[in-house]
């Protein structure tokens, strides 16, 4: 796998789970002899929702909710076959969305 690059994007609502999963990926890649760039924190997406608490009157009574989506990026430069096998066997947390692309 010469001149290859694996780009891993992690997404989730809990930043602690993402950091833990990122640390596992980086540790696994370094242990198998690959060169790692990252983790790079990407901008957090904040979605805000405002909801009226009363069904009919009292427009001033509102609740506000926020949903934060945290993202991290890890680049693995020049991965070995052992690196790819170890990453495929890696079991990450359930609350983390992982996207892997080869470049």
UniProtKB/Swiss-Prot annotation:
Disulphide bonds in the chain: none
SMART domains linked to this entry: Ribosomal_S10 (SM01403)
Sample GO molecular function, one term: tRNA binding
GO biological process: translation
Alphabetical keyword list: Ribonucleoprotein, Ribosomal protein
GO cellular component: ribonucleoprotein complex; ribosome
Role: Involved in the binding of tRNA to the ribosomes.
Subunit structure: Part of the 30S ribosomal subunit.
Family of this protein: Belongs to the universal ribosomal protein uS10 family.
Full protein name: Small ribosomal subunit protein uS10
Organism, scientific name: Shewanella sediminis (strain HAW-EB3)
Classification lineage: Bacteria, Pseudomonadati, Pseudomonadota, Gammaproteobacteria, Alteromonadales
Originating gene: rpsJ
């Amino acid at each position: 796998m010469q001149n290859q690059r694996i780009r891993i994007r992690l997404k989730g609502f809990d930043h602690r789970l993402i950091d833990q999963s990122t640390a596992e990926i980086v540790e696994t890649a370094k242990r198998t002899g690959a060169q790692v760039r990252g983790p790079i924190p990407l901008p957090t997406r904040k979605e805000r929702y405002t909801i009226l608490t009363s069904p009919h009157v009292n427009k001033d009574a509102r609740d506000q909710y926020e949903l934060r989506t945290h993202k991290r990026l890890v680049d693995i430069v020049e991965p070995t076959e052992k690196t790819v096998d170890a990453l495929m066997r890696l079991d990450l947390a359930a609350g983390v969305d992982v996207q892997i692309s080869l470049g």
